[in-house]
């Protein structure tokens, strides 16, 4: 990233209403507890509608029937989405059995949705079941604290079961970072777990009384895998190992993908390298990055409030120097690291500890019993007999981790009988979508419901051009908020309107380049016609080992995005 003339450290002006709401919320309590008892509406009123996000929930409604209900003079069919806090995606089989039961008995859709932030979501929780879901999670050692809104969200960690020792160390750091950056308010425990109100004043030494200016995302990544897509995140700790043992981290700050259609003040941005730090400084540095963003982030405009915009406004070196000052360290030069891929290794992998790990491809992360493919029942049966744990990946897949040789056949039999090991193409394995319709209030176009048939069509094109054994990192996101991480794909579709998408090209396989818009507001047939021609050219003209995204740049089909703050919209 180029350094532009540094701007003000703090943006002066009228604060957004979100800042008022946080300040007046009494450390995130609001009147949520009272609202729970209001049976006249299925939703939360006033500030509580937004405050519940700090407690891991979003209020949604079924958009498929919204117009019909409006005609009948009924309020929207409100239900909550709840997202669990699950650093590194590791969940025990006991916990899995509990969430399976809750999903089946207490949600409208009956499904467990794995997300690309290595956790699970319940969709369709009615208001009467909101308190019970928090209590169920607590009973098995889980919570939903700080998985949404202006806090440090669920901390990701590379799913690398092969190098078990390194993964174990990195995972422990992901947990420590998550715990260190949690809010200290007792609101969550008081409202959901019926813990007594204590006559002490709440304090938030790290997050402050008005919390962060905007959402904040953190990862721990183990090269050469970039499965967690570090450049989509505000703060990234890249594991540096010596002789298979973790010794420190490279720190990269200021990634983020969310944009707004037509708003050139918004842009996706890759993270900037700050330097290397030994392990013992990890928590101090994490806190320093968060508090610098807390104090310098833009609280007058939520569309320009994320860390990426703060870095561009004040300058990377200024931000880095402030982090060093607050943490009491000097960063060492970045240690060498490289990425070779982002996908999960589907199927069995033997770890260096001689245990086996089975990665199951879960299309769109949606776990449900489908006709002839009882995925949810199959995973429940595995959870009942498996002595290791489950791991949710950032590609929305699931790893049955730590399977001894003696248990392998038994687990494989259940997985095969449940449709969990059905053969899929390399292209399908490397494609992903966010949830979008019918539950997401921000959705502009279909994503999860669109992807399976769209990939059928892409598979046909790959076969037509003789490249069925290859893949293109392809992602669909229903709106420019970017949950599907399309702005780090080789081919990214960003929803514009029902049935219409912006087509972005020119990202790369390893997720280190932002793609540029190639065509705007086009339909699926138009997308397929463009990709038919381009895949054909790639098949014929590519160099050895050249990915589709790199080819589109080299062939002059699309100009690479070099400095997105300045050239993304050119």
Curated annotation (Swiss-Prot):
Tagged with keyword Transit peptide: no
UniProt key word Heme: yes
Biological source species: Shigella boydii serotype 4 (strain Sb227)
Summary of the function given for this chain in its UniProt record: Component of the sulfite reductase complex that catalyzes the 6-electron reduction of sulfite to sulfide. This is one of several activities required for the biosynthesis of L-cysteine from sulfate.
Disulphide bridges: none
Gene it is expressed from: cysI
GO biological process: cysteine biosynthetic process; hydrogen sulfide biosynthetic process; sulfate assimilation
Protein name: Sulfite reductase [NADPH] hemoprotein beta-component
Cofactor section: siroheme; [4Fe-4S] cluster
InterPro entries linked to this entry: CysI, NiRdtase/SiRdtase_haem-b_fer, Nit/Sulf_reduc_fer-like_dom_sf, NO2/SO3_Rdtase_4Fe4S_dom, NO2/SO3_Rdtase_4Fe4S_prot, NO2/SO3_Rdtase_4Fe4S_sf, NO2/SO3_Rdtase_FeS/sirohaem_BS
Subunit composition and interactions: Alpha(8)-beta(8). The alpha component is a flavoprotein, the beta component is a hemoprotein.
Catalytic activity: hydrogen sulfide + 3 NADP(+) + 3 H2O = sulfite + 3 NADPH + 4 H(+)
Binding site for [4Fe-4S] cluster: 434, 440, 479, 483
Any one GO cellular component localisation term in the record: sulfite reductase complex (NADPH)
């Amino acid at each position: 990233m180029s350094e532009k003339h540094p701007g003000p450290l703090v943006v002066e002006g009228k604060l957004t209403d979100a800042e008022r709401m946080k300040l007046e919320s009494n450390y995130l309590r609001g009147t949520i507890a009272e609202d729970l008892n209001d049976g006249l509406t299925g939703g939360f009123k006033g500030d509580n509608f937004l405050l519940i996000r700090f407690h891991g929930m979003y209020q949604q409604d079924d958009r498929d029937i919204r117009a019909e209900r409006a005609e009948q003079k009924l309020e929207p069919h409100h239900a909550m989405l709840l997202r669990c806090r699950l650093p590194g995606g590791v969940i025990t089989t006991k916990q899995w059995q509990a969430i399976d039961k809750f999903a089946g008995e207490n949600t409208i859709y009956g499904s467990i949705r794995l997300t690309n932030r290595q956790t699970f979501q319940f969709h369709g929780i009615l208001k009467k079941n909101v308190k019970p879901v928090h209590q169920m999670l607590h009973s098995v050692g889980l919570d939903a604290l700080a998985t949404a809104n202006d806090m440090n969200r669920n901390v990701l960690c590379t799913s690398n079961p092969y190098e078990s020792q390194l993964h174990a160390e990195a995972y422990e750091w992901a947990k420590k970072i998550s715990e260190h950056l949690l809010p200290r308010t007792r609101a969550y425990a008081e409202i959901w777990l019926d813990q007594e109100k204590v006559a002490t004043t709440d304090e938030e030494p790290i997050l402050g009384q008005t919390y962060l200016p905007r959402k904040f995302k953190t990862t721990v990544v183990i090269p050469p895998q970039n499965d967690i897509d570090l450049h989509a995140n505000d703060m990234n700790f890249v594991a540096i190992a010596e002789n298979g043992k973790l010794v420190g981290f490279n720190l990269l700050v200021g990634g983020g993908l969310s944009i707004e259609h037509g708003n050139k003040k918004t842009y996706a941005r890759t993270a900037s390298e700050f330097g290397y730090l030994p392990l013992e400084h990890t928590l101090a540095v994490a806190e320093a990055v968060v508090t610098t963003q807390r104090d310098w982030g833009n609280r007058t405009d939520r569309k320009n409030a994320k860390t990426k915009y703060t870095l561009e406004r004040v300058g990377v070196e200024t931000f880095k120097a402030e982090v060093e000052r607050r943490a009491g360290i000097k960063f060492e030069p970045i240690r060498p690291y490289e990425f070779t891929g982002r996908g999960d290794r589907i199927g069995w992998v033997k770890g260096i500890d001689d245990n086996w790990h089975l990665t199951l491809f879960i299309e769109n992360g949606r776990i449900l019993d489908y006709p002839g493919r009882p995925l949810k029942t199959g995973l429940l049966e595995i959870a009942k007999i498996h002595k290791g744990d489950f791991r949710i990946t950032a590609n929305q897949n699931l790893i049955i981790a730590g399977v001894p040789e003696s248990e392998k056949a038994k687990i494989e039999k259940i997985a095969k009988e449940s449709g969990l090991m059905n053969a899929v193409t390399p292209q399908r394995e490397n494609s992903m979508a966010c949830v979008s319709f019918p539950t997401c209030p921000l959705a502009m176009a279909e994503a999860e419901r669109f992807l399976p048939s769209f990939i059928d069509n892409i598979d046909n094109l790959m076969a037509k051009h003789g490249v069925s054994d290859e893949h293109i990192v392809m992602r669909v996101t229903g709106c420019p908020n970017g949950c599907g991480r399309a702005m780090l794909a080789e081919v990214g579709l960003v929803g514009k309107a029902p049935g219409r998408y912006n087509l972005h090209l020119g990202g790369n396989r390893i997720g280190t380049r932002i793609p540029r818009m190639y065509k705007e507001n086009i339909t699926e047939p138009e997308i397929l016609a463009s990709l038919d021609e381009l895949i054909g050219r790639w098949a014929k003209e590519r160099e050895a080992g050249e990915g589709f995204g790199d080819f589109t740049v080299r062939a002059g089909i699309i100009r690479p995005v070099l400095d997105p703050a300045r050239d993304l919209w050119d």
